[in-house]
């Protein structure tokens, strides 16, 4: 992404900051990069990060310890479709580049709406397909040709790099994504396209 992902993340965290949340759930936290960024930008917040992969969480715990944030970030293995939290447990929920991997996206949104407090905000950042017919051919060439070739050079897991463009193309985008959020019980949904639409930030509230 040529470093653009850092800019996108800053914008997404700006959406989180607007609500001054005290308790944040970071879904699909992976190696905790987003959880750590949230903790640094919101010094009074406590962050819970969940992920299915214990291996990634182990890496995340080492990163959290190195950052000296063990008292503010808790990482645990959990399924986003069956969140192990009581109703209305969090002021804000974030998902960075994870919803396209949900097995059942609507069910995932319903679970997140369940554990979100009234007045709380959901912030999702996800890769997307540019809507512009002028940009789309270059984007498709990059995702379908450049990324898989680069993947073969740097990794033996070629499938992981070919899966990326497939998963981006398959996930709901724009109005279709906000419609799912609303069906799950969220309101005042909105989306903002970043960098010609290769990334989109979605927001919604629980009323």
Feature roles, as predicted:
Residues 2-22, 37:
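Conserved alpha-helix/loop element of class I SAM-dependent methyltransferases that forms part
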Residues 52, 104, 127:
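Short beta->alpha hinge that forms the Motif I/post-I loop of the SAM-binding pocket
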Residues 81-92:
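A short acidic, Gly/Pro-enriched loop at the edge of an enzyme's catalytic core
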Residues 125, 129-184, 190:
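C-terminal alpha-helical "lid/dimerization" subdomain adjacent to the S-adenosyl-L-methionine
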Residues 185-207:
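Core SAM-dependent methyltransferase catalytic element
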């Amino acid at each position: 992404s040529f470093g653009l992902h850092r800019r996108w993340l800053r914008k997404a965290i700006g959406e989180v900051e607007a609500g001054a949340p005290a308790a944040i759930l970071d879904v699909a936290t992976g190696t905790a990069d987003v959880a750590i960024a949230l903790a640094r930008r919101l010094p009074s917040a406590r962050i819970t990060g969940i992920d299915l992969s214990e291996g990634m969480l182990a890496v995340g715990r080492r990163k959290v310890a190195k950052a000296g944030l063990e008292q503010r970030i808790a990482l645990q293995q959990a399924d986003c479709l069956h969140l192990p939290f009581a109703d209305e447990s969090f002021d804000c929920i974030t998902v960075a580049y994870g919803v396209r991997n949900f097995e059942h996206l609507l069910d995932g949104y319903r679970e997140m709406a369940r554990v979100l407090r009234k007045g709380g905000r959901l912030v999702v950042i996800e890769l997307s397909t540019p809507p512009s017919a002028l940009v789309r051919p270059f984007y498709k060439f990059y995702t379908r040709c450049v990324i898989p070739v680069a993947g073969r050079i740097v990794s033996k897991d070629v499938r992981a790099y070919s899966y990326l463009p497939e998963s981006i193309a398959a996930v709901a985008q724009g109005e279709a994504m906000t419609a799912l959020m609303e069906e799950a019980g969220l309101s005042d949904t909105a989306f903002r396209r970043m960098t010609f639409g290769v990334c989109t930030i979605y927001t919604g509230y629980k009323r």
